[in-house]
């Protein structure tokens, strides 16, 4: 599976994942909206939005 792994609004980069899912975490801090992308579907703390999906580059 190919997942996107760029941070926030950086140009898209991808990585090959052994997992069968990709994730996108979104949260707010003093710099504004932060986005983290990667492989798998991690646990997140309250207040962090998590989207997991199972198709190539679905977490862009």
Curated annotation (Swiss-Prot):
The keyword Disulfide bond applies. SUPFAM superfamilies: Snake toxin-like. Disulfide bonds join 3-22, 17-39, 41-52, 53-58. InterPro entries: Snake_3FTx, Snake_toxin-like_sf, Snake_toxin_con_site, Toxin_cobra-type. Keywords: Acetylcholine receptor inhibiting toxin, Disulfide bond, Ion channel impairing toxin, Neurotoxin, Postsynaptic neurotoxin, Secreted, Toxin. Binds to muscle nicotinic acetylcholine receptor (nAChR) and inhibit acetylcholine from binding to the receptor, thereby impairing neuromuscular transmission. This is Short neurotoxin A. It comes from Aipysurus laevis.
């Amino acid at each position: 599976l190919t997942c996107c792994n760029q941070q926030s609004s950086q140009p898209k980069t991808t990585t090959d994942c052994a997992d069968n899912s990709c994730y996108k975490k979104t949260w707010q801090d003093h710099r504004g909206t932060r986005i983290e992308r990667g492989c798998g579907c991690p646990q997140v703390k309250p207040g962090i939005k998590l989207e997991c999906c199972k198709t190539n580059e679905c977490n862009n």
